[in-house]
């Protein structure tokens, strides 16, 4: 099986840590970076977490799906159908915004590790970020206001749902990694 390899320069930096990304100005700074990314030329591939969820579920079913996941995964099709409506305006996304992929160099935030990048609903990106950083309602409102210019309850609902999808997908990824 052929592997793709990309080598880049080493960036001397420190990990941002999820607590640092809770600060209001850091949320605004990160949103500025994301809006630049989301406004860039489309990537050559799309990213759909549901594709990964089904893939990971199939791997896990071979050894028995963890019982704790069964009730959640029984509803994943319904959630996917509801969110499919929003997959029409895809933008370039990172799709894996855990704290380890957000670093600080010379007091500047940088996003690294684009192996799951692809075109996606920007609300998935914001939902993924909000879950990984464990944002509370106030911080999610700050995120939405910074990104969209206003608080919109429909957008907040989409971000929260996409955060659940992200959490399910990356949790399944963790289960798969633990089995290997």
Give the residues covered by each predicted segment.
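An alpha-helical support segment within catalytic cores of ATP-dependent transferases
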Residues: 42-95, 105, 151-153
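Active-site activation/catalytic loop segments of kinase-like enzymes and analogous catalytic loops
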Residues: 123-151, 164-179
């Amino acid at each position: 099986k052929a592997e793709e390899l990309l080598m880049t320069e080493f960036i001397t930096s420190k990990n941002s840590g999820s607590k640092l990304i809770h600060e209001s100005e850091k949320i605004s700074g990160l949103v500025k970076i994301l809006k630049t990314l989301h406004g860039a030329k489309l990537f050559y591939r799309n990213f759909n977490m549901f594709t990964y969820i089904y893939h990971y579920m199939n791997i896990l079913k071979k050894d028995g799906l963890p019982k704790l996941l069964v009730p959640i995964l029984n509803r994943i099709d319904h959630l996917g159908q509801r969110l499919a409506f929003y997959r029409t305006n895809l933008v370039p996304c990172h799709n894996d915004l855990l704290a380890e992929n957000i670093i600080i160099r010379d007091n500047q935030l940088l996003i690294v590790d684009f192996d799951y990048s692809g075109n996606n609903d920007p609300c998935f990106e914001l939902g993924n970020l909000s879950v990984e950083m464990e944002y509370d309602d106030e911080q999610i409102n700050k995120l939405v206001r910074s990104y969209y210019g206003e608080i919109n309850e429909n957008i907040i609902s989409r971000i929260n749902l996409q955060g659940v999808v992200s959490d399910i997908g990356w949790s399944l990824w963790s289960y798969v990694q633990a089995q290997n």
